[in-house]
């Protein structure tokens, strides 16, 4: 974006300084000038008191106490340049007042370079891995695993005793031999403990 201002078509500059007395000076730039009315007011304690008393407490804000000194704030604002609105600068300069060539034409160029480079690349990767365990069959669930107990008999030739077993319930049982062997061994261990005591 480029903005060009041709100062040859601007009005004349006139500045008036007021401090109990006024004087007028005029300066010319490229045949034309800018008009502005400036007024400076010296800080006055009475003017400050009138200013503060004329405002309600609700209207007094941080801008009234610059540098934590209200008198300094009042002096800063009262000494500020006051521009006359009637002597404003018009940016709509007529093309008839411009010369046919750029000779004698002062130009001010304001160049604004604004570059916006936005790179919005979003890489997203979602990986979901699920491992399903094989479901055991109903047979495996209903089946209970007991620890295996093995017992060896001290006697190679021993006779199974059916005297304390229920009639007809433990015939041809494959665990009967191991049961009696384990029972005999437990009896021997118990007898040995009694003897040791």
From Swiss-Prot:
This is Non-structural protein 5. GO terms for biological process: viral genome replication. GO terms for cellular component: host cell cytoplasm. Keywords: Glycoprotein, Host cytoplasm, Magnesium, Metal-binding, Nucleotide-binding, RNA-binding. Its cofactor is Mg(2+). Residues 17-30 have a biased composition (Low complexity). Belongs to the rotavirus NSP5 family. Residues 17-36 are annotated as: Disordered. Mg(2+) binds at residue 92. Homodimer. Interacts with VP1. Interacts with VP2. Interacts with NSP2; this interaction leads to up-regulation of NSP5 hyperphosphorylation and formation of virus factories. Interacts with NSP6. Participates in the selective exclusion of host proteins from stress granules (SG) and P bodies (PB). Also participates in the sequestration of these remodeled organelles in viral factories. One of its GO terms (molecular function) is RNA binding. It is found in: Host cytoplasm. O-glycosylated. Plays an essential role in the viral genome replication. Participates, together with NSP2, in the formation of viral factories (viroplasms), which are large inclusions in the host cytoplasm where replication intermediates are assembled and viral RNA replication takes place. Orchestrates the recruitment of viroplasmic proteins such as capsid proteins to these factories. Participates in the selective exclusion of host proteins from stress granules (SG) and P bodies (PB). Also participates in the sequestration of these remodeled organelles in viral factories. Its main location: host cell. It holds the Pfam family Rota_NS26.
């Amino acid at each position: 974006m480029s903005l060009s201002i041709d100062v040859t078509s601007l009005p004349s500059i006139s500045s008036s300084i007021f401090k109990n007395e006024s004087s007028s000076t005029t300066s010319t730039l490229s045949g034309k000038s800018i008009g502005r009315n400036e007024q400076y007011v010296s800080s006055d304690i009475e003017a400050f008191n009138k200013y503060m008393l004329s405002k309600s407490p609700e209207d007094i804000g941080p801008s009234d106490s610059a540098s934590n000194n209200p008198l300094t704030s009042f002096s800063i604002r009262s000494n500020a340049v006051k521009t006359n609105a009637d002597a404003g600068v018009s940016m709509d300069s007529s093309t008839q007042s411009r010369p046919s060539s750029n000779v004698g034409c002062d130009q001010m160029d304001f160049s604004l370079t604004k570059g916006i480079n936005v790179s919005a690349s979003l890489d997203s990767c979602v990986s979901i891995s699920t491992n399903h365990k094989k479901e055991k069959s109903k047979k495996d669930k209903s089946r209970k695993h007991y620890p295996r107990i093995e017992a060896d008999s001290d006697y190679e030739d021993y006779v199974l005793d059916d005297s304390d077993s229920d009639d007809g319930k433990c015939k041809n049982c494959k665990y009967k031999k191991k049961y009696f062997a384990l029972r005999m061994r437990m009896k021997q261990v118990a007898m040995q403990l009694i003897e040791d005591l």
